[in-house]
Each structure stands twice: as C-alpha cells, then as structure tokens.
C-alpha cells in the first residue's frame, strides 16, 4: 500500500501475531514462526512445532501467541501449548491442555488466559493446566481481564467470571468487542456492559 511504513509479502496464511519487545512475532500456517524487529527485519525463524494428537495430525492451527518473560508461547486450536525461546526460537517446553473441544480464541492477561471454545464455553488457564471451565449458551467473541475478573461478550451474551463465580446476562445483539467500558455489537451499536465492578 502506498501509505504503509513498510510491507512484506508472505507465502502462507498468518494465523497468530503478537507484539514483543522491539518488534513482533507471527506464525504462518504450515510454515513456521518468525520474530521481526520494528523495521520488519527478520531476527529469527523457527519451524512450526510438530503437533501430534492422533486425530487431526497436520491440521492443527496456531491460533494465538503470548509472551511470558523470555518465552514466546504458541497456542494451538487442539489445546497444545508450545514455549519457544525469545532469543533464538528454539523449543523449550510443550504441554497439552485438555479442554475436550477445539479452541477458537485465547485471551491473555499477565498471569492467566481465557480460552473460548468452539461450541460455546470458556476455560481459564495459567498456561500449565485448566483451572476451571464453564459452559456458555454460545461462542465468546471477545474477553478482557479487569480488576481480577474476566469480562466477556459473544453470541447474545455478556459474562463475568470472578473467583470461580460465573455471571451471565443475555443480550439481543452479538457482542463482538469492547470499546472502553462498553460493548460493540454486530450492528455497530455501543451498548452498556451489564456488570459493574466491585
């Protein structure tokens, strides 16, 4: 694009991206993981971690990335979590979070994460194990961590998870994101989030 600061073409679909100190990292489907500096110069590239779960070999997708200290964490839709070194992209650790279904999205806070599951439902994790899970009446589209609670919106629902207690409120439209303290819905409206913070 004419007004871009920089642009690069890629030969596969980007499936996850995250900001890191001095640049960003991204994953390309079936290709690999890349760390770039702020000028889009490659710092390192690593092969996509091999994924074996017996059912969908080769079809898993890296859907999210997060950073914890010097670790780049890759989250896959089948529950696999792979830790890579921020220094050189080498694999440090891997584990499988047992959630029972495909993960649609991962929302991150400093010390924990919220998984949005494909048929509705959420699971809270510390990236090592699932701490709790709850069904929802539809898919969760957006979530954020505020004042010790997870707040989320989605398919005709808003919700709040605080100290193991899940509160749900139904809505007419589909919540697709948060704008400040309000919910953006699929019809372009900004609506109030129904839960007040303590």
Please place each PLM-identified region on the residue numbering.
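Eukaryotic tandem repeat interaction scaffolds
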Residues: 60-146
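Solenoidal tandem-repeat scaffolds enriched in leucines and small polar residues
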Residues: 6-85
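A sequence-composition feature that detects small, non-aromatic residues
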Residues: 2-4, 12, 16, 27, ...
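Repeat-unit-sized solenoid/scaffold elements
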Residues: 29, 38, 42, 46-54, ...
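Repeated scaffold domains used in trafficking and secretory/extracellular systems
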Residues: 9-21, 52-66, 98-111, 136-149, ...
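Surface-exposed loop/turn elements that mediate protein-protein interactions on large endomembrane-trafficking
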Residues: 1-7, 34-51, 80-96, 120-138, ...
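Short beta-strand elements that form the blades of beta-propeller/WD-repeat-like
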Residues: 1, 22-27, 33-34, 70-75, ...
């Amino acid at each position: 694009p004419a007004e871009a600061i920089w642009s690069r073409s890629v030969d596969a679909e980007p499936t996850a991206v995250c900001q890191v100190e001095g640049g960003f990292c991204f994953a390309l489907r079936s290709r690999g993981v890349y760390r770039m500096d702020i000028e889009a110069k490659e710092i390192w590239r690593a092969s996509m971690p091999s994924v074996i779960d017996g059912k969908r070999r080769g079809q898993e997708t890296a859907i999210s990335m997060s950073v914890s200290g010097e670790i780049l964490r890759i989250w896959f839709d089948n529950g696999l979590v792979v830790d890579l070194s921020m220094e050189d992209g080498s694999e440090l650790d891997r584990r499988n979070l047992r959630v029972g279904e495909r993960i649609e999205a991962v929302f991150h806070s400093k010390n924990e994460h919220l998984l949005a599951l494909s048929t509705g439902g959420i699971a809270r994790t510390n990236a090592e194990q699932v701490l709790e899970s709850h069904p929802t009446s539809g898919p969760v589209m957006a979530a954020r961590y505020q004042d010790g609670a997870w707040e989320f919106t989605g398919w005709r629902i808003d919700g709040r998870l605080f100290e193991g207690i899940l509160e749900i409120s139904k809505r007419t439209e589909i919540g697709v994101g948060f704008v400040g303290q309000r919910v953006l819905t699929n019809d372009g409206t900004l609506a109030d989030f129904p839960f007040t913070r303590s």
